[in-house]
Amino acid sequence: MARIVGVELPNNKKVWVALTYIYGIGRSRSFEILKNTGIDPEKRVGDLTDEEISKITKYIQDHFKVEGELRSEVERNIRRLIEIGCYRGIRHKLGLPVRGQKTRSNARTRKGPRPSRIKTKKKSS
């Protein structure tokens, strides 16, 4: 298994698919990386040479924020929205949808599970 920017990539996958295992790299970026480093996207990770792995790693580190760096930036951005008290920040704080979706009947994922009702026994008279 090849290790690129701290992520173990499975040997049996094609390189373009394996690169999408890295947080911050999707299909488009994966193909862009391979095009600019001159590596065949259809090649398997197990067939990559050490030189090719270091090429990919260097290109990613020079051009993109990935993994922990990207996660912390996203977290900082959300924290900033909450601190300045804008509408989006308030929605994040309350755990509601941020991008204008309706919430009357949907948004169960964002709102979390419904509070369970406690059933009370009826007294027989």
Swiss-Prot record:
<feature type="compositionally biased region" description="Basic residues">
    <location>
        <begin position="101"/>
        <end position="125"/>
    </location>
</feature>
<dbReference type="GO" id="GO:0003735">
    <property type="term" value="F:structural constituent of ribosome"/>
</dbReference>
<dbReference type="Pfam" id="PF00416">
    <property type="entry name" value="Ribosomal_S13"/>
</dbReference>
<keyword id="KW-0689">Ribosomal protein</keyword>
<dbReference type="InterPro" id="IPR027437">
    <property type="entry name" value="Rbsml_uS13_C"/>
</dbReference>
<dbReference type="InterPro" id="IPR010979">
    <property type="entry name" value="Ribosomal_uS13-like_H2TH"/>
</dbReference>
<dbReference type="GO" id="GO:0005829">
    <property type="term" value="C:cytosol"/>
</dbReference>
<keyword id="KW-0699">rRNA-binding</keyword>
<dbReference type="GO" id="GO:0000049">
    <property type="term" value="F:tRNA binding"/>
</dbReference>
<dbReference type="InterPro" id="IPR019980">
    <property type="entry name" value="Ribosomal_uS13_bac-type"/>
</dbReference>
<dbReference type="InterPro" id="IPR001892">
    <property type="entry name" value="Ribosomal_uS13"/>
</dbReference>
<dbReference type="InterPro" id="IPR018269">
    <property type="entry name" value="Ribosomal_uS13_CS"/>
</dbReference>
<comment type="subunit">
    <text>Part of the 30S ribosomal subunit. Forms a loose heterodimer with protein S19. Forms two bridges to the 50S subunit in the 70S ribosome.</text>
</comment>
<dbReference type="GO" id="GO:0019843">
    <property type="term" value="F:rRNA binding"/>
</dbReference>
<keyword id="KW-0687">Ribonucleoprotein</keyword>
<keyword id="KW-0820">tRNA-binding</keyword>
<keyword id="KW-0694">RNA-binding</keyword>
<dbReference type="GO" id="GO:0006412">
    <property type="term" value="P:translation"/>
</dbReference>
<feature type="region of interest" description="Disordered">
    <location>
        <begin position="97"/>
        <end position="125"/>
    </location>
</feature>
<dbReference type="GO" id="GO:0015935">
    <property type="term" value="C:small ribosomal subunit"/>
</dbReference>
<comment type="similarity">
    <text>Belongs to the universal ribosomal protein uS13 family.</text>
</comment>
<comment type="function">
    <text>Located at the top of the head of the 30S subunit, it contacts several helices of the 16S rRNA. In the 70S ribosome it contacts the 23S rRNA (bridge B1a) and protein L5 of the 50S subunit (bridge B1b), connecting the 2 subunits; these bridges are implicated in subunit movement. Contacts the tRNAs in the A and P-sites.</text>
</comment>
<protein>
    <recommendedName>
        <fullName>Small ribosomal subunit protein uS13</fullName>
    </recommendedName>
</protein>
